[in-house]
Design a protein with these regions (language model features):
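N-terminal binding-site loop/beta-alpha segment at the start of enzyme catalytic domains
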Residues: 15-114
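Beta/alpha (TIM)-barrel catalytic core signal, keyed to glycine-rich beta->alpha loops juxtaposed to Asp/Glu
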Residues: 23-24, 156-346
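Conserved, mostly hydrophobic/aromatic
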Residues: 38, 50, 64, 79, ...
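Acidic (Asp/Glu)-rich catalytic clusters
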Residues: 39-40, 73, 103-113, 137-144, ...
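Active-site mouth loops of central-metabolism enzymes
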Residues: 51-62, 120-130, 159
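Short, acidic/polar
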Residues: 60-71, 128-143, 191-195
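Active-site groove signature of glycoside hydrolases
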Residues: 143-159
C-alpha cells in the first residue's frame, strides 16, 4: 500500500561538532516531516501531529514545554488539543483544564499562531443546551485563542442529525471561528451522509477523519466502504492510536517490562496487541530500527493518511517518533511487504 511520494528522500547531512551542540546534532539526524494536504481544505499539515490527550496536565510544565519546543524545532506544524474532564483530582476546573494548560504551553513555546494548524473537538456533550458555537467558544476562551484551524465533530448524540451538524459547522466557518472541519470516529455511512448534506447546504466538505489505525487495528481505515466514503468527501485520514496505547513502542520486548500487556493476554484484544508487538520488535531488529517509528511508518505508507497523531511526555519520544518519516521514505518494497504482514493474522 505504498505511495510513490514515499519512495525517495534521504536524511539531511549531519553538521560538524564545532558548529552545533550535541542536542542540535540529534535534531539534524531526524528527517523533518514533509507536508501533506489535509483533504481538499487547502491546508497542508506535517506528516506527524502532536497530540495532548491526558498529557500536559499530568507532567511538570517544563517537561510539557520541552516536548512542544522539540516538536517545533523538528518541523511539526499540526497540533491537536481537546477538552476532557479532570482525572487528577487537582485541576482548578472540572473540565477543560487541559485546554488552559495547552494554551499556556503554546504561548511559552515561541510558536506564532499562524505557523501551526490547530485542531480541537466538538463533543456535543451538553447538546442541545450547548450548540457547536457555544462549545467552541468555551474551548477558545480556555486556550485564549481567536480561532482554530480544524474542528473534529464527534459522533452525534441521539436527536442531533448529521444535517444539523453540517449547518452548525458551516456557521462556525462563516464566523471565522474555524477554517475547516472533520469527523472523529464516524462510520463510513455517516461520512457519506455528511458529504451529501454539505453539497445540499453549500458547506465545505469534511476534510479529515480522525480514525484509529495501526498494525493491530486496520479496520475501518482499510475497509472498502470507508475508502469510498473518504474519496467521495475528498477527506484525508488523521491516524490515531497508531502505537496502540504504547503496545507498539517496543517496551514489551524488553526483559521484565511492566505495563498493561506485560502479563500476557488478559483478553483477546490485549492478546492480539501483544502478539503484534512481538512480531514488530523482531522486524525492527532485523531492519536495524525501533518499533515505534516502524509502527508509525506503517500508517504513513497509506496514501489516505495525511498525518499520524501521537502524544509524548519527553522530547526524546518526539525525536524517536519522527524517525518514522525517513523510514517511510526509504524502506524498500520487501521491507514494506514484511511490515504489512506484521499482525496480519492477529
Amino acid at each position: 500500500m505504498g505511495d510513490g511520494r514515499l519512495c525517495s528522500g534521504q536524511a539531511g547531512g549531519v553538521p560538524s561538532q564545532d558548529r552545533f551542540s550535541r542536542s542540535t546534532l540529534l535534531f539534524r539526524e531526524v528527517t523533518a516531516p514533509k507536508r501533506r494536504p489535509l483533504g481538499a481544505s487547502g491546508i497542508d499539515v506535517s506528516e506527524l501531529s502532536l497530540g495532548s490527550w491526558r498529557t500536559y496536565e499530568r507532567i511538570p510544565r517544563d517537561a510539557g514545554l520541552a516536548v512542544m519546543n522539540r516538536a517545533r524545532e523538528l518541523g511539526i506544524n499540526f497540533l491537536d488539543d481537546a477538552r476532557y474532564n479532570d482525572e487528577t483530582g487537582t485541576a482548578p476546573l472540572k473540565t477543560g483544564y487541559s485546554e488552559v494548560v495547552f494554551g499556556e504551553l503554546f504561548r511559552a513555546s515561541g510558536w506564532n499562531r499562524d505557523e501551526v494548524v490547530l485542531a480541537n473537538k466538538l463533543w456535543w456533550e451538553f447538546w442541545p443546551e450547548q450548540d457547536a458555537a457555544a462549545e467552541l467558544d468555551g474551548s477558545l476562551g480556555r486556550m485564549k485563542m481567536d480561532y482554530i484551524d480544524l474542528a473534529y465533530a464527534e459522533q452525534p448524540p441521539d436527536g442531533l442529525t448529521v444535517e444539523r451538524i453540517v449547518l452548525e459547522v458551516g456557521g462556525l466557518i462563516s464566523a471565522g471561528k474555524i477554517r475547516a472541519w472533520g469527523v472523529l470516529n464516524w462510520p463510513a455511512p455517516m461520512i457519506a451522509e455528511a458529504a451529501k448534506s454539505c453539497a445540499k447546504a453549500g458547506v465545505h466538505l469534511p476534510c479529515a477523519a480522525q480514525l484509529a489505525y495501526s498494525l493491530v487495528k486496520r479496520s475501518p481505515v482499510e475497509d472498502a466502504d470507508t475508502v469510498e466514503a473518504l474519496g467521495a468527501a475528498g477527506a484525508s485520514v488523521v491516524s490515531s492510536f497508531t502505537l496502540d496505547g504504547g503496545a507498539l513502542t517496543g517496551k514489551y520486548a524488553q526483559p521484565g517490562a511492566q505495563g498493561r500487556l506485560s502479563g500476557g493476554a488478559e483478553d483477546e484484544r490485549h492478546a492480539a496487541a501483544f502478539r503484534v508487538s512481538q512480531e514488530l520488535a523482531a522486524l525492527a531488529q532485523r531492519l536495524g530500527t525501533q518499533s515505534a517509528p516502524l509502527a508509525i511508518a506503517f500508517a504513513l505508507l497509506n496514501p489516505l493518511v495525511a498525518s499520524v497523531l501521537f502524544g509524548s511526555t519527553t522530547p526524546d519520544q518526539v525525536s524517536d517518533n519522527l524517525k518514522a518519516v525517513e523510514l517511510a521514505a526509504t524502506l524498500d518494497a520487501d521491507a514494506i511487504e514484511q511490515l504489512r504482514r506484521v499482525g496480519a493474522e492477529s
